[in-house]
A protein has these predicted regions:
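Non-catalytic alpha-helical scaffolds and adjoining flexible linkers that form interface surfaces
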Residues: 1-209
């Protein structure tokens, strides 16, 4: 099989022997794939940066049997601000785990990759509340996956009178269920945080850059 040129971002990096790495990469056309980066741990390796967690770049791959191998990489964005901030790194790692669960191999992941990159950009380059960013990410991802969050009733019990929005569960809750959720915000009008989360999650231009 010939070489494949694709953009991608590293979701997971694992050491393999003394000098190599096994990576999980999200690409727009191939979906989530596993690929080996030979010699990536060597100090002078051309793959040293391109094989790191959250590196987004232009990759040249080739496939042997069932495994992809990285020939070369041209890094585009490494999200440096996330790497140096523990809080930002925690949230970026959390959304990465969600992306891992939501994607598969051999499926078009263009829109999910776009959402993931835009969310990482928001975490890295802005001072927006990280819980807000996470909640909007979850709402937008659910929409991409074909799941519409409940709006008119409580996520937990189905009560119609909902007064709180859960940042943790990305949906509305009644006053009783909200007592068990520290991330629930009282809704008092369209301009409050909870409604901003919902409207941002529904807006196609949210996180666009």
């Amino acid at each position: 099989m010939g070489t494949i040129k694709t953009k991608g971002i590293i979701l997971v990096e694992r050491n393999m022997g003394d000098f190599d790495k096994m990576l999980t990469m999200l690409t727009p056309g191939l979906g989530k794939i596993s690929c080996a980066a030979r010699g990536a741990k060597r100090f002078k390796s051309s793959l040293l940066v391109g094989s790191q967690f959250l590196c987004f770049g232009e990759y040249v791959l080739y496939k042997s049997a069932s495994t992809y191998y990285i020939n070369s990489c041209e890094p585009i964005e490494i999200f440096y601000n996330i790497r140096k901030d523990l809080d930002k790194l925690k949230y970026a790692s959390h959304i990465t785990k969600i992306i891992m669960d939501a994607t598969d191999e051999n499926e078009n992941a263009y829109k999910i990759l776009q959402l993931y990159l835009n969310t990482l950009y928001m975490i890295s380059e802005t001072d927006k509340d990280l819980e807000f960013v996470l909640a909007v990410f979850k709402l937008k991802l659910m929409n991409l996956l074909g799941f519409t969050p409940q709006i008119g009733k409580c996520l937990n019990c189905g009560e119609q009178n909902v007064e709180y929005f859960s940042l943790r569960d990305s949906g509305f809750k009644c006053s009783i269920c909200a007592k068990q959720d520290k991330g629930a915000i009282h809704t008092t009008g369209r301009n409050n945080t909870s409604n901003k989360v919902y409207y941002a999650g529904s807006n196609k231009k949210s996180f666009f850059f």
